[in-house]
Amino acid sequence: MNPSTTQARIVVDELIRGGVRDVVLCPGSRNAPLAFALSDADRAGRIRLHVRIDERTAGYLAIGLAVAERAPVCIAMTSGTAVANLGPAVVEANYARVPLIVLSANRPYEMLGTGANQTFEQLGYFGTQVRAAISLGLAPDLTGPNAADLDTLNAQWRSATCRVLVAATGARSANAGPVQFDIPLREPLVPDPAEPAGGTIPPGRPGGRSWTHTPPVTFDQPLDIDLTPDTVVIAGHGAGEHPNLAELPTVAEPTAPPPANPLHPLALRLAHPKQVIMLGRPTLHRPVSTLLADPSVPVYALTTGPRWPDVSGNSQATGTRAVTSGAPSAAWLRKCAELNEHAVTAVRKQLAAHPMTTGLHVAAAVADALRPGDQLVLGASNPVRDAALVGLRPDGIKVRSNRGVAGIDGTISTAIGAALAHDGRTVALIGDLTFVHDSSGLLIGPTEPTPRSLTIVVSNDNGGGIFELLEQGDPRFSDVSSRIFGTPHDVNIGALCHAYHVDYHQIEADALGAALEDPFQGMRVLEVKADRSSLRSLHASIKAAL
């Protein structure tokens, strides 16, 4: 067996032993040893392999798989720009703490700087965005008088692979995230002609165990908090479970655990709490940001890892869990419950009275159609905010969204990855710009695994509706804002779906519920035409009703 093939097979075997079950592969020549090894593992039923053409979207496919599976996922690619295309996914994985392993095949390092084709200094390319950048080193000659000792190499290669897995899963840091595993490969890049399929490699540990076992670290920082003052909980992305805080009024973002005592984000301005407990990282609502920045309101930050958010610098203490004393007053709980009910009712009444279909109407229709066992994937920009405003019935529903750096890129691919890892129905709600941006993510080859049931709902207001609600949407900029911020595109979404052989229907918002109730297997797109010109007035009417 040649060196590159041997090395690749040992690495793949050890990755599987370390918990990798899904791998995304992008085609190339330099990563051929990895491709053959991964294909063998796929045929043996040890992994599920997903082959994609575009590394940028493939990275987000891996993120969707990793988030839904709560397990490390690898993406393998060839050298050169193939590696650079992983940049956006790596950044998202960093801030969302997703265990994404970038298996970047490389040329032998002596070829760097020589003008060799498809070669650049890719080891360390991702800089501070990865938990580690680890090189396996070039596999030496395994035959002849100067042959290296294969047992020694087996131990070294498996040990290095375990370091990659530990860094990605955060087993020793409580801070999962992306890792670059750079593997220089010398020709020959294909298995030897006389070699049997699958070949043989030196064994790993008995019983399928990892070469180097690393128990996950326990990260526990208790924080004393008195609940007697009027307290609200702000539950952001990655909030974690805190049963002893369940009684408190909670403004929960859609990706946070469902609150037992919800407080609508628009009701927060009227609540006037005396202190805040912040869980995870809030990413959505301006009333939340305003409250967290108020120096007169103490903020206590509880996170599940070593980092904590504090945009305004106002947090008084941090920890991982609250040790509570005291109890909220009945009057405070009653006040917040009334404010929440008033806000929920106001939103729904204003939606019913509004003459145009907007993204909020589409989000409400999707939210009302969800049922226990569903998985909901929300696009960045307006969809995730709309879902928070119309209110979700979160019991038994898993909600996903790329909130690490909150970009619109890769959302279709993320949804497909999440759907591939989910046994039930997945519904994705995204905007038209998000859809167009990642439309190549719809490409699933005829031999590839496909989602069991994925419906992508596209709220199409022909541009960036969120800018209607920001300063850029002020009427005084009306002569230029539509072009330079709204960016109308007039893309035929149905034609795009047809090109990728994806089932497509255009429907009205009030027909969404019935459409989502129909049993569906596979992947489809439902487009709902929406209006963004009236978004500003709709949101103003909701605030006025409060």
From Swiss-Prot:
Q: Which SUPFAM superfamilies match?
A: Thiamin diphosphate-binding fold (THDP-binding) (SSF52518)
Q: In which pathway does it act?
A: Quinol/quinone metabolism; 1,4-dihydroxy-2-naphthoate biosynthesis; 1,4-dihydroxy-2-naphthoate from chorismate: step 2/7; Quinol/quinone metabolism; menaquinone biosynthesis
Cofactors (names)? Mg(2+); Mn(2+); thiamine diphosphate
Tagged with keyword Mitochondrion: no
* Superkingdom, taxonomy of origin: Bacteria
- GO biological process entries: menaquinone biosynthetic process
EC number of the protein: 2.2.1.9
User: Is Magnesium found in the keyword set?
Assistant: yes
Q: Which reaction does it catalyse?
A: isochorismate + 2-oxoglutarate + H(+) = 5-enolpyruvoyl-6-hydroxy-2-succinyl-cyclohex-3-ene-1-carboxylate + CO2
Please name the InterPro entries in this protein's record: MenaQ_synth_MenD, THDP-binding, Thiamin_PyroP_enz_TPP-bd_dom
Give the cofactor binding note.
Answer: Binds 1 thiamine pyrophosphate per subunit.
Q: What class of enzyme is it?
A: transferase
UniProt keyword annotations, A-Z: Magnesium, Manganese, Menaquinone biosynthesis, Metal-binding, Thiamine pyrophosphate, Transferase
- Give a GO molecular function annotation for the protein: magnesium ion binding
Family (UniProt):
Belongs to the TPP enzyme family. MenD subfamily.
Described function:
Catalyzes the thiamine diphosphate-dependent decarboxylation of 2-oxoglutarate and the subsequent addition of the resulting succinic semialdehyde-thiamine pyrophosphate anion to isochorismate to yield 2-succinyl-5-enolpyruvyl-6-hydroxy-3-cyclohexene-1-carboxylate (SEPHCHC).
Q: How does it assemble?
A: Homodimer.
What's the protein name? 2-succinyl-5-enolpyruvyl-6-hydroxy-3-cyclohexene-1-carboxylate synthase
Q: Which organism is it from?
A: Mycolicibacterium smegmatis (strain ATCC 700084 / mc(2)155)
Cite the source lineage: Bacteria, Bacillati, Actinomycetota, Actinomycetes, Mycobacteriales
This protein's encoding gene: menD
